[in-house]
A protein has these predicted regions:
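Generic structural motif recognizing short loop/turn segments at the entrances and edges of beta-strands
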Residues: 1-2, 6-8, 13-15, 22-28, ...
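Noncatalytic regulatory segments and standalone regulatory/sensor domains
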Residues: 161-239
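Active-site nucleophile-adjacent alpha helix/oxyanion-hole segment immediately C-terminal to the catalytic cysteine
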Residues: 1-82
């Protein structure tokens, strides 16, 4: 029997996937690259912020329509550097986005982790996957980053998971590089090797049909009470 755990803030409005944004009303959540212009990290972050009740879809559309807005200029520049398979040759790194997000939230609510031993944010691969599972069990989304042997890095938002035996955790994701299927809460599936402790390409991306490594994540923690305001127009952030 198929059993999966999904985050709390996902709904169907007719056949369309929706989430409750900043206003508390149901709004569009899935953003495909090209709708706002930009790279996968920015698109995944925007979906994360809607799922975390920090933004509404119309907030994003208003910024994208305003050609004088720094947000629009930044993501349009990234669109010009758009690479193959939804990657980017020069986009925002997840670690940098996490730092900027904490500035605009005025609190260290965003956390970034990676199992890449070349950085100081190192956790083991097993610990990284445990953090993904724990966050999803709390009903909260996770931005996950991966890379393949030759292709550029890619970022998606995990919104659910299932366990396929002891070895595999199957992640159900919103992937900005593709379309969302009719009456479905996800458009990509990534299998992670829960027992892997090395740098081998043992994870698998079903959308790109390629072996990858899920090696970094960004999560947003619950704010203290009262809830802190989120200022997407802060001059300290690049989007």
């Amino acid at each position: 029997m198929f059993t999966a755990k999904f985050i709390d803030n996902l709904y169907f409005n007719g056949a369309n996937i929706r989430a409750k944004g900043k206003s508390g009303k149901l709004c569009k959540v899935f953003a495909k690259q090209g709708q706002l212009d930009g790279a996968c990290v920015i698109y995944s972050l925007m979906m994360m912020l809607i799922l975390e009740h920090k933004l509404d879809w119309e907030d994003l559309r208003e910024k994208a329509r305003n050609s004088k807005d720094d947000f629009a200029k930044s993501i349009q520049r990234q669109f010009l550097n758009y690479g193959l398979k939804g990657g980017t040759r020069r986009g925002h790194r997840m670690c940098d986005v996490s730092k900027k997000l904490n500035v605009c939230m005025k609190e260290n609510l965003s956390e970034y982790y990676t199992c890449d031993k070349r950085t100081w944010h190192t956790v083991s691969r097993h610990e990284l996957y445990e953090k993904i599972r724990t966050q999803l069990d709390l009903g909260k989304p996770v931005m996950i980053g991966s890379h393949g042997e030759n292709g550029p890095g890619h970022a998606v938002v995990a919104v659910g998971y299932s366990r396929e035996g002891l070895k595999t955790m199957r992640l159900f994701c919103l992937d900005p590089s593709g379309f969302i299927p009719y009456m479905q809460l996800w458009n990509n599936v990534i299998d992670v090797d829960y027992l892997a402790e090395n740098d081998m390409l043992t994870d698998y991306d079903y959308h790109f049909e390629d072996k990858i490594i899920v090696d970094r994540i960004l999560i947003i923690n619950d704010p203290p009470k009262p809830a802190l305001s989120f200022d997407p127009d802060s001059k300290a952030i690049p989007f």
